[in-house]
């Protein structure tokens, strides 16, 4: 199937005079291509049953040294792996018919075909909201993306086994988000890692309480401060209302806030709000575990979740959420 998915694409091109496989190799095959203008070249195909971004990066390094025309052939190629290939000029072909190849006067590009084979080779579970241990480890890594981390330190810091940390690191390394160095582990692509995290983070709709208050936004935020003083109930700003505390790049007309599940109804009564199906100006998220408020800060007397949590939450907000997430990422996380 790997041979056919490449051959079919090339033979459909009007400027291809001849395409044939001239030999098999240990990890693929070599094909000869002849153009209608007489130009000939060879393609060195690398076949892999499972492919990760880290695998592709190694192939690209090999290609750069050999100066050969290399392509990747695999049952499934993820969007990120495909992008890495394109950015580095390496062609790719998968069994669903998705492909990309640029060379001489050839331009092949087909995307969006659903893969009928095995599910995407990625570990979604590490990013799910329910993966509390993975979340804690990831949050610790993002406490300082310039730092090199030891497995033992991370396991002690988040109170889990070294095996759990090692398992997570394996996934991060396979996806070229983290690199293993002689003195520890280092995040090498924080933006891509966070983007992937935010995608899975928003896949499952979480419970939230949409409310309406007659007060304006600034008055609501002031009353949230009083909520702590008068009732002892903690609240933590997030979303756009939290993000502007770090970088005021957007205007907003809705307050997003975390409150412990057992305190939500009392908070709604104290704030004189009503739960509504539409037209809300306050959204309360249940504080399901403490990882959401790790490294929170007090800014202007308001408790605000960390820049990392702001990013994850803002990426789920339609409209200007992504703009806020990007601003917080650049100012607070990648600094």
PLM features: residue spans?
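Hydrophobic alpha-helical interaction segments
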Residues: 92, 270-335
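Charged, structured surface patches that assemble and position nucleic-acid processing machinery
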Residues: 89-101
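Short alpha-helical segments that sit at the start of domains
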Residues: 109-138
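Membrane-interface helix-loop-helix junctions at boundaries between adjacent transmembrane segments
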Residues: 97, 124-126, 153, 157
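Short, charged, surface-exposed secondary-structure boundary motifs
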Residues: 102-106
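Loop-centered beta-sheet repeat module
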Residues: 137-198
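Short gly/ser-rich loop at a beta-strand->alpha-helix junction or flexible surface loop bordering the NTP-binding
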Residues: 204-290
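DNA-contacting interfaces and partner/effector-binding or oligomerization modules
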Residues: 1-90
């Amino acid at each position: 199937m790997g041979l056919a998915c490449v051959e079919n694409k090339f033979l459909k091109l009007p400027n291809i005079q001849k395409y044939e496989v001239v030999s098999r190799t240990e990890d693929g095959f070599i094909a000869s291509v002849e153009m209608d203008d007489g130009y000939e070249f060879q393609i060195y195909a690398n076949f892999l049953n499972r492919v990760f971004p880290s695998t592709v990066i190694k192939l690209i390094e090999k290609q750069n040294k050999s100066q050969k025309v290399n392509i990747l052939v695999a049952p499934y190629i993820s969007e990120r792996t495909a992008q890495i290939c394109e950015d580095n000029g390496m062609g790719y072909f998968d069994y669903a018919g998705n492909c990309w190849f640029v060379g001489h006067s050839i331009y092949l590009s087909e995307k969006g075909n659903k893969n009928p084979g095995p599910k995407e080779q990625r570990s979604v579970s590490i990013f799910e909201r329910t993966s509390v241990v993975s979340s804690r480890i990831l949050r610790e890594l993002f406490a300082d993306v310039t730092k090199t981390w030891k497995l033992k330190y991370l396991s002690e810091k988040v109170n889990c086994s070294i095996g759990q940390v090692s398992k997570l690191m394996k996934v991060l390394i396979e996806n070229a988000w983290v690199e293993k160095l002689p003195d520890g582990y280092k995040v090498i692509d924080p933006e891509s890692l966070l983007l992937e995290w935010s995608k899975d983070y928003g896949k499952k709709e979480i419970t939230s309480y949409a409310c309406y208050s007659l007060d304006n936004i600034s008055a609501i935020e002031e009353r949230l401060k009083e909520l702590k003083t008068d009732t002892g109930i903690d609240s933590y700003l997030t979303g756009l209302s939290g993000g502007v505390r770090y970088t005021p790049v957007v205007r907003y007309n809705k307050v997003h806030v975390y409150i412990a599940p057992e305190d939500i109804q009392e908070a709604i009564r104290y704030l004189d709000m009503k739960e509504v199906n539409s037209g809300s100006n306050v959204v309360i998220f249940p504080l399901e575990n403490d990882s959401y408020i790790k490294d929170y800060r007090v800014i202007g007397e308001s408790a605000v979740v960390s820049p990392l949590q702001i990013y994850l939450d803002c990426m789920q907000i339609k409209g200007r959420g992504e703009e806020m997430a990007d601003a917080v990422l650049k100012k607070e996380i990648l600094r």
